[in-house]
Amino acid sequence: MKVVIPVAGQGTRLRPHTHTVPKAMLHVAGKTIIEYILDEVYAVEPDEYIFIIGYLGDKLRPFLEKKITKPVRFVVQGETLGIAHALHQARDYLKDDPFLIVLGDTIFQADLGRIVKKGVSAIGVRVVDDPRRFGVVVLDGERVMKLVEKPQAPVSTLAIAGVYYISDPGLLVDSISRVVEGDIKTRGEYQLTDALQLMVEAGHDIETFPIEGWFDCGEPSALLETNRALLARVEEVPKRPGSIIIPPVWIDESAAIQNSIIGPNVSAAGGAIIKDSIVRDSIVSEYAAVEALILQGSIIGDRATAQGRPASLNVGDSSQVELA
């Protein structure tokens, strides 16, 4: 079975970090976003991985080739015109066998093995409070009756979570071709939801399955919230002599921590250096350097340097000092 993972988006809401690093390669709680996704996908033992790349694809390609031992194919999406458009670029490789589609920008948890074994087309869903931000499904019993992209008037609270199993690849490829070649756009893009709706209207049964864990990584605040949620599962407390570690945290073995207070909710990636600082609720990326700073709710990008200046204070009893 094949797994198709579109990762061509520019991640504009995560700038400046995505100016130089693909969104899928951003670090959160010890791993990149794409590594979390691959961990879930490994359960179905794919025969081939197809990545649809575009923006900064030259950085993603070697990274993925090192991570995956099975055959990997890369397809270029020249313009980011929607998920249906992305899949249309890979249509020649999708016609024959059932496959999974997993969007490359959201960390999730689901029993994919059960879905694949059942063999019925299915969409991963999760109940949300505000469905206007998502594509949603409307059910008739267990089957999908209608799909709507980001409805302004509430029609369902079952949000599409970016994971799909397709049992009839030929029908999906034909439906995507109708959307793209017929210039059917919703909100300015060629949407996968429109292609899936065509499949439903053609009489194809599509069911849903629950996404147990769903962690948004679309903007800085969401990335930090995901970091907090994933760190809550980390039981080990790393030790760094001369520093105070307040769990939960994740610190790579190669990260250097000197005379600092780290945590809670901090991840420090490989090669990071944190010296004479207080850091909480933050992500410090690979080979980043933080010195003489108080950080909270911050993301320090790969190889970035954030440096303050040491201060000598003489503070009396019952006083309060805030360092900005």
What are these regions (language model features)?
Residues 11-16, 132:
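Short N-terminal binding/cap micro-motifs at the start of the first secondary-structure element
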Residues 2-5, 13, 26-27, 31-103, ...:
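Conserved N-terminal catalytic core of the sugar/cofactor nucleotidyltransferase
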Residues 50-54, 125, 283, 299:
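Short internal beta-strands
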Residues 25, 137-139, 208:
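A structural signal for short hydrophobic beta-strand segments in well-ordered beta-sheet cores
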Residues 107-183:
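Conserved core of the sugar-phosphate nucleotidyltransferase
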Residues 14, 60-64, 172, 176, ...:
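Hydrophobic packing residues within well-ordered alpha-helices of enzyme cores
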Residues 10, 105-106:
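Active-site metal-binding loops of divalent metal-dependent hydrolases
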Residues 178-324:
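Left-handed beta-helix
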